[in-house]
Structure formats: C-alpha cells, structure tokens
Swiss-Prot record:
Keywords: Activator, DNA-binding, Nucleus, Transcription, Transcription regulation. Component of the CCAT-binding factor (CBF or HAP complex II), which consists of one copy each of HAP2, HAP3, HAP4 and HAP5. The assembly of the HAP2-HAP3-HAP5 heteromer (HAP complex I) occurs in a one-step pathway and its binding to DNA is a prerequisite for the association of HAP4. This is Transcriptional activator HAP4. Residues 1-127, 393-422 are annotated as: Disordered. Its main location: nucleus. GO terms for molecular function: DNA binding; RNA polymerase II-specific DNA-binding transcription factor binding; transcription coactivator activity. It comes from Saccharomyces cerevisiae (strain ATCC 204508 / S288c). Acts a component of the CCAT-binding factor, which is a transcriptional activator and binds to the upstream activation site (UAS2) of the CYC1 gene and other genes involved in mitochondrial electron transport and activates their expression. Recognizes the sequence 5'-CCAAT-3'. HAP4 encodes a regulatory subunit of the DNA-bound complex and seems to provide the principal transcriptional activation domains. Does not bind DNA directly, but augments the binding of HAP2 and HAP3. Residues 101-118 have a biased composition (Low complexity). Residues 124-300 are annotated as: Activation domain 1. InterPro entries: Hap4_TF_heteromerisation. Residues 359-476 are annotated as: Activation domain 2. It holds the Pfam family Hap4_Hap_bind. It comes from the Eukaryota.
Amino acid sequence: MTAKTFLLQASASRPRSNHFKNEHNNIPLAPVPIAPNTNHHNNSSLEFENDGSKKKKKSSLVVRTSKHWVLPPRPRPGRRSSSHNTLPANNTNNILNVGPNSRNSSNNNNNNNIISNRKQASKEKRKIPRHIQTIDEKLINDSNYLAFLKFDDLENEKFHSSASSISSPSYSSPSFSSYRNRKKSEFMDDESCTDVETIAAHNSLLTKNHHIDSSSNVHAPPTKKSKLNDFDLLSLSSTSSSATPVPQLTKDLNMNLNFHKIPHKASFPDSPADFSPADSVSLIRNHSLPTNLQVKDKIEDLNEIKFFNDFEKLEFFNKYAKVNTNNDVNENNDLWNSYLQSMDDTTGKNSGNYQQVDNDDNMSLLNLPILEETVSSGQDDKVEPDEEDIWNYLPSSSSQQEDSSRALKKNTNSEKANIQAKNDETYLFLQDQDESADSHHHDELGSEITLADNKFSYLPPTLEELMEEQDCNNGRSFKNFMFSNDTGIDGSAGTDDDYTKVLKSKKISTSKSNANLYDLNDNNNDATATNELDQSSFIDDLDEDVDFLKVQVF
C-alpha cells in the first residue's frame, strides 16, 4: 500500500465539518425578547402609588431581529411632529393634581401664556423687513428736503420783497399749476422726479444779483378762455423739467423745434415782432432762468442793475434789452451807450471770425462778442530781477534763439581749433558752462535751462555705449599686438594713456618669450601646439589685466 492510497483512505474516513452550514443553523428564527420575560415569577408586575391610585407597568418592548437592517417608514409630508401636541412640563403636574388650588393654578397658567404671547408679539414687531426700513428712510429724507425747500422759499420771498422796486409781480398759468400739483402729489416718493419748485429754488440763487425781465419779449398773461399759443408753450417748457410732460406740450414743442428747417415767422403766428427762433431755443436750453415768469412793460433804469462780470452784462443786453431799444430811457443811459460802443468795436474786430454760423445749433450764446483783455507787448521782454517769480528765470523765445545761434558758432569754432575734440560731448559741455558763467544776462539757473533747451546739450553716455566702446578698445589693442613688430614701440608713445601703456608693457614682455619659444621649436613638429598654448595663456593674462583696469576706471 502506497502513501497515496493511504492518504485517500484517511480523507474519506474523516468527517467533514461545514462551518458555514453550522453557523446558518445557529441563527435563531424565532423572536428573541431583549427585556426580561413578563411570565417569569421573579419579574412580576411592579406596582407604585400615585395619589392613592395603583397602576400596572406595561411589559417591555420586544424587538424582532432580521438579516437586513431596514430604515423606519418615512413620515407623510405635511404631518406635524408630536412635539407640538405635548403640553409643557409645568402644566402636567397641575392637570394631575386634584384639589382646591386647581382653579388658581389654571388662572396663573393662562396669565403666563398671555404674557408670553405679548413678548413674542413685541419681538416680531421689532423685526421690520428691510424694504420697509428703506421706505421709512426715504420718507424722512424727503421730508427733510421739503423742509429745506420751504425755508429757501421763505428766504427768496424776503429777498423779493426787499427788491420790489426792480422786480414785478409774477403769474402762473392755471393749467400748468394744476398739472404741477398733480405730478407733485403722484410722484412724491420717486427720486427720479425733479420737482419744479426745486429748480426754482436752485435758479433763484443764480439770479439774485440781478432780478430782471426773464422773458425775451413782453406779452400779456394768458386768460382762462384763450388757449396757450406757441410762444407761451415754449416759455412754459423752459421751466418744466419733468420726465413725462403733457402730450399737448410735447406735440407743439416738436412742431416748433424744427424752426431751423423752415426759418420764417409762419411757424410762430402769435409771437411778437421782435421774437426770433434763436431766443426760443435759448429759452428751452437755458435752465438758469427763474421759473416764475416775470412780465414788465419796460426797464426803468439800467444803471441800477448789477452784474457779476462783463460776460453776464453782454448776455443780458443781447437777450433782454432788445425790446427796450426804442424807449426814451435808453437814449441818455451810460450803460447802454457803453454797451453799444463795445458791440461796435468787437464786431469790427471779429467780423471775419463769425462768418460761418452753425444752423443746427443756433444759440445766441455762441455769437456773443467776448471782450479780449489787452496785453502789453513788452511784458515778456522786461524782466525785473527784484521780483521773485519763476517765469523770470525762464528764457524767452528771442533769448533762446540767440543762445542757440551762439552755441552753433561756438561749436564751429571749436571744431576748427581742436580737431581731436570734435565728438567729445564733455568738452562741449564744459566750454558752454564756462561761457555761461561769464555772461551777465543769466544766472546759474538760467544757464542750466538754456543748455537743456539747446540742440548741443550734454547727455551722459549710457551703459551700453560704454561697454561697446570698451569692447572696441580691447579688440583693437589685441589686434595691434598680434600683427605688430616685436618691439611694439610706436612714435606716438608719448600720448598713450594708462590702458595702452599696460597693454604695451605686457606685449613687450610676452613677445621676447614667444621669440625664444619659436627658436627652440623650429625643427620640431609640435611647434604649432606650443604656439597655440602660448597664445591662450597670453589671452588669459590679457583678460586679467582688463578686469583690473575695469576696477580702476569704474
């Protein structure tokens, strides 16, 4: 019997143990109670007393085991949790207790609930939404702004009452005032709406220095029965700046704004004789006019009017004084006569400047004659040395030309005298500096400024130029050494600088050693190799000398 058959018999007689099968048999299929059994005599039902009543405790919960873990069922959507239905812990004892104080405890609980509800309501009131807060802040700002405008209107009324001799009573059309009040009530909280009264308050500050006739022509206020003509519509539109105007106003304005295409008076049938389309456009585009349209028959005295400057005076006469040219008051008026003289003078001088007129933008402000200030011709030439002014140190155009011509002459003379210093910029700078020091017309600061302005001013060389110049010198010296005679002594040895002297001394010392090496190696085949070695060693020595000179020079 072989060993193989013995092993087969032994394996057949050995009992097989299925580990997984045994474990499967050990898993309990019946439910197993985790808590102690209620039927056992040791774990009988427990009794306890609570206000004289006895209750039995329920049996413990039995959990069924399973192979797979399963999640509990999901609650239905919209189902409230049990925490909302539970009563507070303080109220449970009151419900269970039965006695004479039960009514008092219930009353106290009701009072506590009312107080808690009030506290919650007060907290909810404190939490105001953000948009309501912004609306409140906006209303506060608007009220403050309206209070400021009211104060400004009171100040303007006081000023108008003090200047009643110049100003005249104003009027406002009923249709426009009702439209203005309606818009003010509708868009009070709108920031984009610009109120007409705000423009009135702003423009009254601009025109406090002279209260004059705001309309370019004299016309009577419109009555309730008569309709507004084109001129009244234009004058009213100059004061209104609302985003959504009346449709009738916009219709008439669109008809009248096309005056430059048909420039005749048929488009303005009800306008006065002296009215021009340019004045209507200036009324529309100029927002510096007061909103309350003041109407006057004539200006009593032009000398009483005060202007801020000459330009404002010319603007006033060009716009508003055209109507009163035929009055007797203006014939003996000095202000009017001076204005006419200034107009004649400026039109004579500037007749060629105003030949081309823009028809698309025919505003009267563009064609106003501007008085030019007379400047003395000798102001630039006369320079007082006592006055400490920066303009006194700057050279004029004539002196600058003289300095440039003088520098040009000096450059030509220096080229003839010294040929070697022809391209030397430092020599030219020093020569210009010496001659500028001797001049009596300019001081040191003036000489530096003139040198900076001249064509021949000194500019220091850049680093790249210095490096290129140095590389050229090194290449030239090495080339002269390699292709010169053995002695290497030229006739111009007296004019050499330190750099060339060092190179020549190095060349003389190495040339003698090279001659000996050439004599020894004439008959050998390795003469070229020794010559190359000697040249490489010489180049290394030359580089060391150049580095030494760089340190000494720079």
